[in-house]
Amino acid sequence: MRTPTLLILVAVCQPVSAGESVRNKHELNQWNPLQASYKIHSGSTAYSEPPTKADSAITVHFGGTAAKRLFDQIGPDVKEGCSDAKGDRERRNKGVHCTFTARLQHPGNSHYRCWIGIDLRTGGGSARVPC
């Protein structure tokens, strides 16, 4: 189903200048600001190559309040996640992959991080984030 995945990406990537509905406080069911990075690639995000006609995807990465909101919405935690560190959690749902890291390596990092991936050939969800 490509429509739900595309709607999630549009909602997450809506620019800050979307109108008067953007407020300082992050709320559900309204447009909120998002600081994010994206990559258009083939393969996984860790070992990516330039996109090809046969394999092209976009992955959007973000943390902070937006990642926590998304993490809270896509539960439950996966049984076997990438991290075995105490307190770490992971949730996945088709093209959405979110993590909670209990112990941060750097004080400026966010406990919550999410990746949203879309296969640009099919429009389907494709979170290509390896462990």
Residue ranges and their predicted role:
Residues 1-8:
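Sec-dependent signal peptide recognition
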Residues 6, 75-76, 91, 107, ...:
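Residue-level signal for mature regions of secreted extracellular proteins and peptides
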Residues 13-15:
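N-terminal signal peptide c-region/cleavage motif recognized by signal peptidases
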Residues 17-28:
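Cleaved targeting-peptide boundary
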Residues 35-98:
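Mature extracytoplasmic domains of secretory-pathway proteins
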Residues 84, 100, 116-118:
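Disulfide-rich extracellular modules and peptides
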Residues 97-106:
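Short beta-strand elements that form the blades of beta-propeller/WD-repeat-like
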Residues 105-131:
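Short, exposed beta-strand-loop hairpins at the edges of beta-sheets
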